[in-house]
Amino acid sequence: GPKRVEEGYNRNLSSYHDLAVFETKGTAPMLGFEKEPLKIGQNAFHFGYPQGKPASIHSILLGRVKINPGRRTRHTEPVIAWAESRRVPNFSGSLGGMSGGPVLDEEGDIIGVSVVESRRRGRIFTSAPKGIQDTLSRSGNINYIKPNKSLKVDIDTERFPSVGKGLRQSRSVSKVLCW
C-alpha cells in the first residue's frame, strides 16, 4: 500500500526490558500471544526491516540466556536464543533494523520481539514472553494486555516469506523509526 508516516503516542519505554510500547492512529489486524511454553527446537519466524529492507527469517529455538542490552540499563536481561536458519531474501550482513519486529510461531501467535543479534554465531535474541507481558502490563493500556486477535495465520518453513509480505502489506508489521 501507500507509504504513510504517523507519529506514535502513549509511548511507554520499559525500564526493565529492551522494549517499548506505543500507539498510532492507523489500524491493522492484530496478532495474538502464544500462551504455551516455548520448546527447544521449535520453529520461529521473524519479520521486519533489517538494513531498512523488508525480510523474513526462519530460526530454531536454542534456549534461554541472559544478556546486557548495554543501552539505558546496566542490568542483565533474560532473552531467548534462536539459531538463524534462513533469510528471505537471502542477504549477508547485519540484521540491524530487525529490532522490535515480531517473532511468530507456526500458528501465527507472538512468541517474542527481536532484540539483538550475534552475527558471528548466527544467533538472534528475542525478548522473553514474560518480558513482553510485563512491559504490556506496565503500559496500563488494557488493549495491549488482552488483545483481540483478528489475524489468523498458519506459517511453515516454506510459506513464511509470503506470510511476512502479507503482514507488511496489512501493516501488522511496520517499519518504526525512533529519534
Q: What is each model feature region?
A:
Residues 1, 150-179:
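N-terminal activation segment of mature serine protease catalytic domains
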Residues 44-47, 103, 114, 173:
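Long, contiguous hydrophobic alpha-helical segments, chiefly transmembrane helices and signal peptides
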Residues 22, 46, 61, 174-176:
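Generic structural hydrophobic/aromatic packing signal, biased to beta-strands
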Residues 7, 43, 58, 100, ...:
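Conserved beta-strand residues within beta-sheet cores
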Residues 47-51, 106, 117-119, 177-179:
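Short, flexible beta-strand-to-coil junctions
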Residues 31, 39-45, 130, 134, ...:
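Solvent-exposed, polar/charged alpha-helical surfaces in well-ordered, non-transmembrane soluble domains
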Residues 20, 25-30, 55-144:
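Active-site region of chymotrypsin-like
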